[in-house]
Amino acid sequence: KEGYIVNSYTGCKYECFKLGDNDYCLRECRQQYGKGAGGYCYAFGCWCTHLYEQAVVWPLKNKTCN
């Protein structure tokens, strides 16, 4: 599974500005989803890879980013 890492309180994606390989995104994806996860910056959001199927990713139901 893949997807944008999301703040469960706000419903917002984690923003990034250095597109492609991005240490911040990799660190955040691994912290939230485990050491096996990958991450990079895609379309100014942190995109996580190698997630377990039940992983929660953006968008969240009933939560809009404000």
Swiss-Prot record:
The keyword Transmembrane helix does not apply. Keywords: Amidation, Disulfide bond, Ion channel impairing toxin, Neurotoxin, Secreted, Toxin, Voltage-gated sodium channel impairing toxin. This is Beta-toxin Chui2. One of its GO terms (molecular function) is sodium channel inhibitor activity. Coiled coil: none annotated. The modification Asparagine amide is found at residue 66. It is found in: Secreted. Belongs to the long (4 C-C) scorpion toxin superfamily. Sodium channel inhibitor family. Beta subfamily. One of its GO terms (biological process) is defense response. One of its GO terms (cellular component) is extracellular region. Residues 1-66 form the LCN-type CS-alpha/beta domain. It comes from Centruroides huichol. Abundance in venom is very low, approximately 0.3%. Disulfide bonds join 12-65, 16-41, 25-46, 29-48. Beta toxins bind voltage-independently at site-4 of sodium channels (Nav) and shift the voltage of activation toward more negative potentials thereby affecting sodium channel activation and promoting spontaneous and repetitive firing.
